Amino acid sequence: MSTSASGPEHEFVSKFLTLATLTEPKLPKSYTKPLKDVTNLGVPLPTLKYKYKQNRAKKLKLHQDQQGQDNAAVHLTLKKIQAPKFSIEHDFSPSDTILQIKQHLISEEKASHISEIKLLLKGKVLHDNLFLSDLKVTPANSTITVMIKPNPTISKEPEAEKSTNSPAPAPPQELTVPWDDIEALLKNNFENDQAAVRQVMERLQKGWSLAK
């Protein structure tokens, strides 16, 4: 099969190359458009809906290695040497992580949150994503030291409300306005001008009723 360009194709390529060499490029090869001038980010691509499980392959291998083995469990002693002290023995799977040990301690009500727990083996802090199979636990080093420090940033349970038996505050007493005394004072000031006294009294009584 011939790969040579036909007449029209050869003519197009020839003219294109000729035009491309007539003028120098206005922009250098290293030119990049400033971000402030970018108005279009191109065609949006759909989100890839896939959750990559980083530890899946390793867990699968551990599961295959455990098949046919009766004594695959990892026996651990979780010991807290600070008050209040405790010691818990439990069988875990080699594919379990340090995070799952912390969750077990929470289920045993030894802590309220994972952030409060720190596990150590031979003085080294164990990270949450570490597999028990990586610890190479033997009967001689099967004790994990537990340190629990309450986290002050975790909100505590709300305090109990005050006893309802405490006496309720007495309702405010309604004030009694001495209208007669006020009227007598007005008569004295207005020299018994009944029209002026009546007008002022009406305004005072109306304002008092609106202020209630």
From Swiss-Prot:
Gene3D superfamilies, alphabetized: Get5 dimerization domain, Phosphatidylinositol 3-kinase Catalytic Subunit, Chain A, domain 1, Single helix bin
PROSITE patterns: UBIQUITIN_2
Record bears the keyword Cytoplasm: yes
UniProt key word Cytoplasm: yes
Cellular component per GO, a single term: TRC complex
Pfam families named in the record: Get5_bdg, MDY2_C, ubiquitin
BP GO annotations: cell morphogenesis involved in conjugation with cellular fusion; post-translational protein targeting to endoplasmic reticulum membrane; protein insertion into ER membrane
Superkingdom to which the source organism belongs: Eukaryota
Main location: cytoplasm
SMART domains in alphabetical order: UBQ
Protein name in UniProt: Ubiquitin-like protein MDY2
Species the sequence originates in: Saccharomyces cerevisiae (strain ATCC 204508 / S288c) (Baker's yeast)
Upper lineage: Eukaryota, Fungi, Dikarya, Ascomycota, Saccharomycotina
